[in-house]
Amino acid sequence: MFGTLGAGLSNFPWLSASILFPIGSALVIPFFPDKGDGKEVRWFALSIALITFLITVGSYINGFDINNENVQLKENISWLPDLGLTWSVGADGMSMPLILLTSFITALAVLAAWPVKFKPKLFFFLILVMDGGQIAVFAVQDMLLFFLTWELELIPVYLLLAIWGGKNRQYAATKFIIYTAGSSIFILLAALAMGFYGTEIPNFEFSHLAAQDFSQKFQILCYVGLLIAFGVKLPIVPLHTWLPDAHGEATAPVHMLLAGILLKMGGYALLRFNAQLLPVAHAQFAPLLIVLGVVNIIYAALTSFAQRNLKRKIAYSSISHMGFVLIGIGSFSSLGTSGAMLQMVSHGLIGASLFFLVGATYDRTKTLKLDEMSGVGQKMRIMFALWTACSLASLALPGMSGFVSELMVFTGFVTDEVYTLPFRVVMASLAAIGVILTPIYLLSMLREIFFGKENPKLIEERKLIDAEPREVYIIACLLLPIIGIGLYPRLVTESYIASINNLVDRDLTAVKSAVKTNIFSGTKKNEILKAPTI
């Protein structure tokens, strides 16, 4: 009996269910009555988000083999055969951790949205649609379908910013849609070019595209376009300016989705398309990714240090931390690339926690100006403890996930003999500046908010209250995996190391075809390097 049950579970369409269930359930919300404060809708949305999370966990437990480098849990249904479009979903090591992260963060974002009273039906409808759409981005195995799911999440984010944002919400929402929708045209053009390459019958499946022998010039053209599109979402400096504005106007649950999931779509796509499907071009552009990553780290850290607005300070901190993802993707070692994957998971958890606390603090103080926040630690001691724990995680304290992921990226890049020693030393030294700046601006932020002379106007008028159980629970749920990964990173790395090793081997093979510059080590130009193991 149990064998039959196990076989049935392994054949269950886990990924399709995790995508379609929250979207289909969202369609029920308009039929809820408009009376009251939306209590029924909130409980319904939370139930759907939790069930979706359980479905994704079920997909990992019942059908995913961590030692298998290939796509698993694959479902392939012909959709529009004349256009070469199929409903093709699956998961490998690069997508499964992010699928789990998406459903987990979304469930907590629904709980974070509990105080939302304005248009709750529309708000939770959009959250659930985003849940399914973002899971689809990581699960689809067809490039044209990827483009459609990539675009699907734009409308919910735009509406969540434009309707529930701050006083400059229309500007922030418009800027977001212009940047992201405008850059997405490059994804569509690359998908069509790659799908029709060398054939009159289009095929957009990743497995087909990976087997194609694209010419070097073709790969370079597609790589540049995709780098722009995904660089906007990551974001890469100077394509980042939409993010501080979006974070500056968003509410706490939208913050969590932006920082926890949306930015990771850019990093995942760079790995999936630029590094995996266009390896020859990636071998040539990898040094540029390293440089851009260092620029991200230093520029955003310096800018964050100068910010006096709490939301914008944390937003630039996110941009800085995503620079480590770029360095990891640009390295040709499995340790560095594995560090990039872990950094995406780690920052998803840490970024969501910090932005939730920003929202919770604003709800009490009604200000984001650090100059107006002072001495609230006496009134909000639990909130101070939560802020301290999450800030220590963000500055990569040993024992927390950020320390492990950044150490893996640094070590992987510094020991990567594909690059010359001077290049590695210079880039690592510059990136270290950002590592030094991070604790400075985060600890000074804590000092300005919670210590110093009390602001009588703030203390008396706002009647500050400490963190409530719901808020403590959300942060505890985020800190638990942050500390767990920091103490035992194999909890996550084991799920993707086989896929990462396969990706790195493919890219190292392409190094032979790369443009020979002084950046690449001369002793390694004419041989295929063996990827170091973790």
From Swiss-Prot:
Q: Which InterPro entries match?
A: NADH_Q_OxRdtase_chain4, NADH_Q_OxRdtase_chainM/4, NADH_UbQ_OxRdtase, ND/Mrp_TM
Q: Name one Pfam family in it.
A: Proton_antipo_M
Name a biological process GO annotation. ATP synthesis coupled electron transport
User: Which range is the signal sequence, renumbered to this chain?
Assistant: none
Descriptive protein name: NAD(P)H-quinone oxidoreductase chain 4
Q: Gene encoding it? A: ndhD
Top-level EC class as recorded in UniProt: translocase
Give the UniProt entry's GO cellular component terms: plasma membrane-derived thylakoid membrane
The main location class comes to membrane
